[in-house]
């Protein structure tokens, strides 16, 4: 296969991977963790994925510890856990 054909194939595979929605089975396991504000006392507006409602919800993060189900924006939460 020529290098142009390989580049086209790589481009198509990349496009397919970007456009394929995340199914429940492909969602990272940390998306199922509950919101955890952590032990510190900061007041940081964050978002977590709520697996029951299947929505990204706002919560206040204390600034340390917590868990991986913690995103700086609703969009980042959606991209990671909802595939949108």
Swiss-Prot record:
Keywords: Disulfide bond, Protease inhibitor, Secreted, Serine protease inhibitor, Signal. The keyword rRNA-binding does not apply. Its main location: secreted. SUPFAM superfamilies: BPTI-like (SSF57362). Pfam families: Kunitz_BPTI (PF00014). CDD domains: Kunitz_PPTI-like. The record marks 41-42 as: Reactive bond for chymotrypsin. Gene3D superfamilies: Pancreatic trypsin inhibitor Kunitz domain (4.10.410.10). GO terms for cellular component: extracellular space. It comes from the Eukaryota. Expressed by the venom gland. Residues 1-24 form the signal peptide. Residues 31-81 form the BPTI/Kunitz inhibitor domain. Disulfide bonds join 31-81, 40-64, 56-77. InterPro entries: Kunitz_BPTI (IPR002223), Kunitz_BPTI_sf (IPR036880), Prtase_inh_Kunz-CS (IPR020901), TFPI/VKTCI-like (IPR050098). It is found in: Secreted. GO terms for molecular function: serine-type endopeptidase inhibitor activity. Belongs to the venom Kunitz-type family. Serine protease inhibitor. This is Kunitz-type serine protease inhibitor 3. It comes from Daboia russelii.
């Amino acid at each position: 296969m020529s290098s142009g054909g390989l580049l086209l194939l790589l481009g198509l595979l990349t496009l397919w991977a970007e456009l394929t929605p995340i199914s429940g089975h492909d969602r990272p396991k940390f998306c199922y963790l509950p919101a955890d504000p952590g032990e510190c006392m900061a007041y940081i507006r964050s978002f977590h994925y709520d697996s029951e409602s299947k929505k990204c919800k706002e919560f206040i993060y204390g600034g340390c510890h917590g868990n991986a189900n913690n995103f700086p924006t609703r969009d980042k939460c959606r991209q990671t856990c909802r595939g949108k």
